Structure formats: C-alpha cells, structure tokens
Amino acid sequence: MLNPVWLKSLVAIVQTGSFQSAARALGLAQPTVSQHLQKLEEQVGVTLVQRSRSGCQPTTRALAFMPHATALLDMHARALEALHGNRERVGASSNIGTYLLQPFVRNYLTTANERGEVDLRIAANPDVADQLLAGQLDAAIMEWWLPHPDFEYRLWRVEPLVLIVSPDHALAEAGCIERDRLVDLPMLGGEPGSGT
C-alpha cells in the first residue's frame, strides 16, 4: 500500500519543481520531504525524481504516475471525509444550480443540526448524470432524468416552457401554444442535453 504522506511529497516536488518549495508548500522540513521520496522510490522500485545541482526533474515514470498519485490522494481524502465529514455532494444542471437551488442550499446550511457542508457541482445535465452514475455525487437535481434501476428519482417541480418571440411574430398573441405548431419553426434552445 502506498503511503499517502509520501505521495503528497512526490506530488508537491513535481508541482513546485524543487524539494525546498515542496517542503515549504507542505509545511515540512526539506530533509523530511527528501526522506518521503526516498521511501516511496524504495517501495516502488523506480527512480521518480532526478536530482542535480541545478534542481530536480521528474522522470518519465513519475510523470506517467502523477495522474494515479493525485487520484489516490483524492480518493484518500474522500475516504476520510466519508468517515469523519458531513459533506453532501450535490450535482445540479446549469439552470437549476444557478437560478433555483441556491436558496435551498443556503437554508440547509443555516438549519443543519450538525456541521453540514454542501459540495455543489454545477454542470451540463449529461455531465451531472455521468457524475451520479460514477458515484461522484450523493444526489442530483436535473432538468430531465432517464430512469435507471440503481436510482430513485422524484419530481421536484414543474416549470413552464416559454416561447419568446418578437412582438410582430405570428405567435406573439397566441397564448398557450400546442406543440404541433412549433415543430417546423426555427428555434434557439439550451445546450445539447439540457431540458430546454
């Protein structure tokens, strides 16, 4: 098992470009960061950083490993959060997250009995659905939902779909318009995957 403390040191070295800067960023002594890297290199059996008088450079293997190291650190942080935290990961499609959800989040944060936090992620509807399916969200509020056997869904609210036309357009005074009258009209709508 890779030690997350050692991984943090490697990531800091690669990101800052030096042992001294990495130590400063981590709030550690420079020899401690060097020791972390040495132990990690011994464990994995490859050199991760080339040291020279002019500084240090990550090896090709270190660069290939970096996405995995950062993913492991992220997973480690999420695991600790799951054990000790009270953070809800909520995804919302763009319009909902921007215009409708904010007062509900604020109300939750001010009335939660425990110290609660909300990690609100606003994205396009398809991206929110993908994050929910990947287990990256605890809940999602979306403009549309295709039923999925692993999830329970509930209708939160219904918003009217409004047609906006110029005052001289034939439909300007039409009131409620049947869907069939709209089929052949050129229209601008929301981004692909949105509910509009």
Swiss-Prot record:
An annotated Gene Ontology molecular function: transcription cis-regulatory region binding
Extract the signal peptide range. Answer: none
The lineage's top-level taxon is: Bacteria
- Say yes or no: keyword DNA-binding present: yes
Keyword terms, alphabetized: DNA-binding, Transcription, Transcription regulation
Task: Give the DNA-binding residue ranges.
Answer: 19-38
**Domain HTH lysR-type residues, every copy:** 1-59
> Mind telling me which PANTHER family this protein's record contains?
HTH-TYPE TRANSCRIPTIONAL REGULATOR, HTH-TYPE TRANSCRIPTIONAL REGULATOR CYSL
What the record says about family reads: Belongs to the LysR transcriptional regulatory family.
UniProt-recorded name of the protein:
Putative HTH-type transcriptional regulator protein PtxE
Which classification does the entry list for the species? Answer: Bacteria, Pseudomonadati, Pseudomonadota, Gammaproteobacteria, Pseudomonadales
Gene designation per UniProt: ptxE
